[in-house]
C-alpha cells in the first residue's frame, strides 16, 4: 500500500503484495476495515471522469469519520488498483485480477472487501459521488 501522484490521501494505491494468491487482502492495517477499491487505468476516459467523484467520496467519508458522523469511524478505506501502473507490484496485480474481481469486464470497476475478504456483489450502482457514498455506508 503506497501513495502516488494521481490520487492523494485518503485514497491508497494497492500492489500485488497486498493480496494473497486467492485475491484476499492481507495488509495488517486493513484488518477489521471496509475497503472499497476502484480498479482503473490512466488510458481509460471513463476512469478519468470517475476519479473526481471517487476522491470526493473518500474525502467526504473521512471528514464524517473525523467528526464522529458514522458508525464506521476509522473503518472505511478508499483504495485503487492502477492496472496500467509502472510502479513495482502494480502490473503484477493483473495476474490475479480475476481473483480480486471475478466479474471484471472493464475499467473502471469497483470491489468491496470487509475484513480482507471480497464481498460478492456488483459494486456501487453508478460511478458518481452519491452512488459511492451510499454503497460504502450501506
Swiss-Prot record:
Active site: 44, 47
InterPro entries: Thioredoxin-like_sf
Keyword Disulfide bond: yes
Keyword annotations from UniProtKB, A to Z: Disulfide bond, Electron transport, Redox-active center, Transport
Site positions per UniProt: Contributes to redox potential value: 45-46
Highest taxon in the source lineage: Viruses
Domain Thioredoxin: 3-138
Disulfide-bonded cysteines: 44-47
Entry similarity comment: Belongs to the thioredoxin family.
Described purpose of this protein according to its UniProt entry: Participates in various redox reactions through the reversible oxidation of its active center dithiol to a disulfide and catalyzes dithiol-disulfide exchange reactions.
Name of the featured protein: Putative thioredoxin-like protein 453L
Provenance organism: Invertebrate iridescent virus 6 (IIV-6)
Amino acid at each position: 500500500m503506497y501513495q502516488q501522484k494521481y490520487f492523494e490521501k485518503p485514497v491508497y494505491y494497492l500492489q500485488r503484495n497486498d493480496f494473497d494468491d486467492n485475491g484476499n487482502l492481507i495488509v495488517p492495517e486493513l484488518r477489521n476495515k471496509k475497503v472499497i477499491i476502484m480498479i482503473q487505468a490512466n488510458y481509460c476516459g471513463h476512469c478519468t471522469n470517475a476519479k473526481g467523484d471517487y476522491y470526493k467520496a473518500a474525502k467526504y467519508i473521512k471528514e464524517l469519520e473525523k467528526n464522529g458522523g458514522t458508525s464506521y469511524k476509522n473503518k472505511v478505506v478508499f483504495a485503487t488498483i492502477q492496472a496500467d501502473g509502472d510502479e513495482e507490484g502494480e502490473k503484477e496485480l493483473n495476474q490475479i485480477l480475476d481473483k480480486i474481481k471475478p466479474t471484471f469486464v472493464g475499467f473502471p470497476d469497483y470491489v468491496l472487501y470487509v475484513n480482507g475478504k471480497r464481498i460478492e456483489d456488483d459494486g456501487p450502482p453508478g460511478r458518481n459521488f452519491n452512488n459511492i457514498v451510499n454503497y460504502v455506508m450501506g
